[in-house]
Regions:
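Small cysteine-rich, disulfide-bonded extracellular modules of the LU/uPAR three-finger superfamily
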Residues: 1-75, 80-114
Length: 114
């Protein structure tokens, strides 16, 4: 059984309220509120996106720029605050992001309820 589009959109809209802060990790962040393997940002902390609701069961976030050290980043984390044990969700990055020197990682979050 599938959800009608209006119901999918309502669920996506609720989800965006859980957290707007995003970060990156060098491995799986795990299933606790403290993201494991999170980057030690070179300037600042996790960065907030600005969510926009669509009409097809999705929400789209504005791009966030994270100042990160050299490393291989395999996962993104969604949190409810810029710091602390506030992780609510995570996802594998595709493709993996490799920084050979300190630089910026750009994430553009999206969520779809299917």
């Amino acid at each position: 059984m599938g959800l009608i589009t209006a119901r999918r959109q309502a669920l996506a809209d609720v989800w965006k309220g859980y957290g707007a802060f995003f970060g990156v990790c060098t491995g799986s962040p795990g299933d606790t509120t403290t993201p494991a393997n999170e980057a030690s940002y070179t300037s600042g902390n996790r960065v907030a996106t600005t969510w926009a609701s669509n009409s097809d069961g999705t929400v789209s976030g504005s791009a966030v720029l994270l100042n990160a050290p050299a490393g291989t980043y395999t996962h993104g984390t969604q949190c409810s605050a810029a710091t602390g044990a506030t992780q609510i969700a995570w996802a594998a990055l595709s493709p993996t992001i490799i920084l050979n020197a300190a630089g910026q990682v750009v994430l553009t979050p999206q969520l779809a309820v299917v």
